[in-house]
Amino acid sequence: MASQTLVSPSPLSSPSLLRTSFSGVSVKLAPQFSTLATSNFKPLTVVAAAKKAVAVLKGQSRVEGSSTLHQDERQQQLMFVSLAYTQGFMVFTYMSMVIPQMGVSQQDHILIQQVDTWCSEDEIRHAGDLGNIVANAEGVAECRQSWQIRYHSLRPNSVVGRALVVHELQDDLGKGGHELSLSTGNAGGRLACGVVGLTPV
């Protein structure tokens, strides 16, 4: 849809002629239409905001599932993860939250401050480290946990647009003594991932 702006001198030099803002184009209006009304723009008011996000987790492996995130009134997030294996099962997997680019650098992780612990139960930790999840005999892993990361897309610790990643090995929580313990938790390769996006409540 296009729009034109009508402009005129004040007072009108000719009561029957107004010109548009486009050069070389003019429109003629009858005298009874020569008085134009204006209105002020009003700021947009947001009356509701989504407080639910979803990430569908898939990859080159046989691991797939979904993660649903809810934001409560205290601005914490409750995450529900459900993962399934089409064959076999895995006892431990490790989940982290990273930016969408699927690189292997530990710099991908959300780092609110530089710390060397990965346990999701530790008071001071990497904000994107979600710890280990356990699959049952049917190969299904489910977990529920909460942590203080916001949905607000303009904040540096927002989950929107970031990715949830399932790794192939048990995370040693930065305490395993391996050369990769403090960077990736020595959690191995990435089995599945999905980008977090907002969804209607």
From Swiss-Prot:
It comes from the Eukaryota. It catalyses: 2 superoxide + 2 H(+) = H2O2 + O2. Keywords: Antioxidant, Chloroplast, Copper, Disulfide bond, Metal-binding, Oxidoreductase, Plastid, Transit peptide, Zinc. Its cofactor is Cu cation; Zn(2+). One of its GO terms (molecular function) is copper ion binding. InterPro entries: SOD-like_Cu/Zn_dom_sf, SOD_Cu/Zn_/chaperone, SOD_Cu/Zn_BS, SOD_Cu_Zn_dom. Zn(2+) binds at residues 126, 129. Cu cation binds at residue 178. One of its GO terms (cellular component) is chloroplast. Pfam families: Sod_Cu (PF00080). Its EC number is 1.15.1.1. It is an enzyme of class 1 (oxidoreductase). It is found in: Plastid, Chloroplast. Binds 1 copper ion per subunit. Binds 1 zinc ion per subunit. Residues 1-47 form a transit peptide. Disulfide bonds join 119-193. Destroys radicals which are normally produced within the cells and which are toxic to biological systems. Belongs to the Cu-Zn superoxide dismutase family. Homotetramer. This is Superoxide dismutase [Cu-Zn], chloroplastic. It comes from Populus tremuloides. The lineage of its organism: Eukaryota, Viridiplantae, Streptophyta, Embryophyta, Tracheophyta. The gene is SODCP.
